[in-house]
Each structure stands twice: as C-alpha cells, then as structure tokens.
Amino acid sequence: MGIAPRHMKTRTSTQNLRKRVRYHFRGNAAGSTLRLTLGCLLGLELRRVGSGGRMTFCAAGEARLSQWMAENAQVCWFEDPEPWTAESELIAQLDLPLNLDQNSHNGFHPQLKELRAQARQRARDLPVSH
C-alpha cells in the first residue's frame, strides 16, 4: 500500500500516483521499497552499486523482477482528499504483509524485516558491482 501525494505541511508534493506506480514497475530497489521487498522474497541477490551507497538487484535481477511484476502484480486505487490518513487506517485494518511502515502488528513483519536486513548485510559484504 502506498499513497500519492505524501503529506507535506510546508510544500506541495511533486509525486503523483502515476509517477509512483511507474517507478515501482520500472525503477530499482534503491528507490522502491516494494521492489526491495519483492526481490528479497524472490531470492534475488542485492548488491551495492555505483559508489557503493545504493543497493539494487543489478540489471539482470531488476529485469527479472520487472518481468515477475508484469506477470503477477496488480494495481488498484481510490481517491481520498487526505490519503495519508486513509493509509494509516487501512494498514491497521487489513492484512498487508508486505508493508513494513506502520505495520509492526502484522505476523509477517519480523520475518520480512529480517529477510531485508540479511539481504542488505550480504550486499555490504560483497564487492561493489559495476
């Protein structure tokens, strides 16, 4: 579950739903927690890239993840004038095992958090991928 725009008290968000969904489907794990989670669950190897500060599944892994998402992921949405409020309420009421933020009550939360932490640690232990 995600929202667009995000709640910003001092400025207007530059993100909209189309941009956020497009990035989840075409971006990489460094900028998408959804891609990071799905890639870890699929057993893709997370690696440090560039100067070593970002982590992705590299070109082949990101392509494989994009293909998996094209075949398996679905998107739905609803409009709300304050989506940040609706997000909190829905996460509290629904079983959304892939959401970590605001979702520590979910039974899968500790396992998913640990899986992602292990993937990040393995990536830190490997050389930077070029």
Task: Annotate each language-model stretch with its function.
Residues 4-130:
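Boundary/linker segments flanking structured domains
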Residues 1:
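Short beta-strand-alpha-helix junction that forms the catalytic/metal-binding core
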